[in-house]
Amino acid sequence: MLNREDSYNIYICGVGGQGIIKTSVIIGEAAMNEGYKVVMSEIHGMSQRGGVVSTELKIGDYKSSTIEKSNADVILSFEPIEAVRALNKANIDTKIVLNTSPIVPSTLNQFNQSYPKVEDIISSLNDNYNFVYPIDGEKLAIESGSLLSLNMVLLGGVIANDTFPLSKKSIIKSMKNNLHSRFHEMNLNAIEKGYDLVKNS
């Protein structure tokens, strides 16, 4: 629950095709259903499959539509290296939820560069931030029924944080309102798997 004068800032990033925009819409609708003001920034980058995408959500009493430097309460990264790129939005107590499955951009091969080891990315984050939650999102999504539920696995991880102002119930209601009924059970399973992983970490 937010105080009237507070805002809660969520930065979501990854690549196109991972469900980033849909995740943002689900959070935003849940916030409005709970009576909060909410604004979602313009999408940066290309939303088609493979292009970098980021959205910024501000819930509550916001002064602008963008998240200022070091002011994110949560960074939700669908791709490990994108979490690193988003760190200008983070402070030491920002909750960082990241998918551990990399999507290696073709540009790395073009310039004979290699993708950093995911373990090194996570280790560096743990050295510098208090709340880092790596999730093998692809594994849990497949266990839930389909890789397409990856975004709901990661969203489940976000809402497990004690400071998250929205209830799991309202997130689930919004998910059901935004996805076809035949996908409800799979995505509910995905939310629960991500939620349980972070709650028990």
Over which residues does each language-model region extend?
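Active-site cofactor/cluster-binding pocket
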Residues: 1-201
